[in-house]
Amino acid sequence: MSAIRLLALILLCTILLGACGRSDLIRVRLLSPIGETKKDHAIYSDLTLVSTSKTTSADPKTSGGSLYFLFKSIGLGLTTLTTQIEKEARTTAGDVLILKEKTTLVTNFTDLAFGIGENYSFMWGAGVLAGGSKLDTSLNYGYNGEPDETLKHKDLSGHSLFLVLGHHGYGFETLLGFRTNYIKAEIEDSGSSAKTLKTAASLNYESTGIRITTNQLQLGIGFTF
């Protein structure tokens, strides 16, 4: 991190701490993602027709939500997010499908949150990946004759960081948040068409050390007691 960014972060934290102060309220907060950072999360790529193919990627889409319970300045939360990732490769001549990848990432996080402020508040924290999380990829191999399949991923792990700004009035809060999720996984590709194509140098992917980072802008409401 550059010196300018570090100074800006220190200044922002100082302003927030000074403006918000300690909270004595009990809060229940609900947040939902309204936007996902545009990024190519594709895991697989075709190697047979690289020079004569075109690739299109749909913007990743995330749904789900977070629920937090804060007692004064500390609280717990649960977050469930589902991110859809799609990428397709076709020939430039004839528009024939070469490879279509559709990945569904389901993440469940247990969050620890800290909060300050009452009329204007600042909440931040971290989450760890919990049970029920999964990463599945559906592959359509197009013209090459290999059967389509869905690959499962194993050894899923990860964590998350988040921050939320809030404005309080008449027992309710309006909330604006940002969340970053870091996911690691390995592919269970034993006996799969993907492994056959990889051995034949027709398909490229990493079976271990897969890393996916997603970022969401969130909006929400809160109730205070």
Residue ranges and their predicted role:
Residues M1-R27:
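Cleavable N-terminal export/targeting peptides
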Residues T14-L17, F122, F225:
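Structural signature of transmembrane alpha-helix termini at the membrane-water interface
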Residues A19-T92, G222-T224:
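Short glycine/proline- and aromatic-enriched beta-strand/turn motifs that initiate or cap beta-hairpins
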Residues T37-I43, T83-T91, S133-L139, I183-A194:
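Outer-membrane beta-barrel proteins
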Residues S45-T52, A93-I98, N144-G145, A194-A201:
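Flexible coil/linker segments and helix-coil junctions enriched in charged and small residues
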Residues G65-F172, I212-T214, F223:
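Gram-negative (and chloroplast) outer-membrane scaffold detector with strong preference
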Residues D155-L161, G166-F225:
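Predominantly the C-terminal beta-signal and adjacent terminal strand-loop region
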